[in-house]
Amino acid sequence: DSMAAVIMEDLDRIKKEFARKRRTVVENAEEAVFEEKKVEEQEVVFLMDRFGYAKTVDVSTYERNKEAADNENKYILHCMNTGKICIFTKDGKMHQVKVMDIPYGKFRDKGQPIDNISNYDSTQEEIVYICDSEQMRYAKLLFATKQGMIKKVEGTEFQVTKRTITATKLQPEDEVVKIQVVTENQHIVLQTTDGFFLRFPAAEVTEKKKGAIGVRGI
């Protein structure tokens, strides 16, 4: 107890000798707001080679190297840096990746494997189609499968926040073989492995939801 009394006495003495008023004042702490730096929107070009390495470059860089870019890359898309790239696979999935998450740089930069920046797994999946999310919003997509099932889907069906969704329902042992943007005045041509062809207007293709199986096309 005597030791405690001595300590308390010393603390009181120090407080009296060295005490000073607080020099700073915290005001409206409950209203403090942290704002993210706004990204300046600009058009870029998405490039992905046959090995799955993806990157974006500015439009002028692409235009200066257009011939080499077209020869070296499997997928080339003009898009906004604030948008998303949609990756459709044979097993009926759609993966999304933000353009901002894709490496941006020089034309000769290698980029990163698309597997590393999205949920796509090149060891288990195969890409059928890649497009820009914003451009797809105003389009209709035609789906065709190995077993001859087809359907049209409104692009707005794929305006989602999830990184991976089911883009179409498939029957057992079936897979997506073709996806493309279609307009009502186009014609569709289906071909069988036996060499039979069937041609019909795109307007006649049944429009369905993304979660539905298509109808028999051929």
Predicted regions and their residues:
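C-terminal interaction appendages of subunits in large macromolecular complexes
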Residues: 1-218
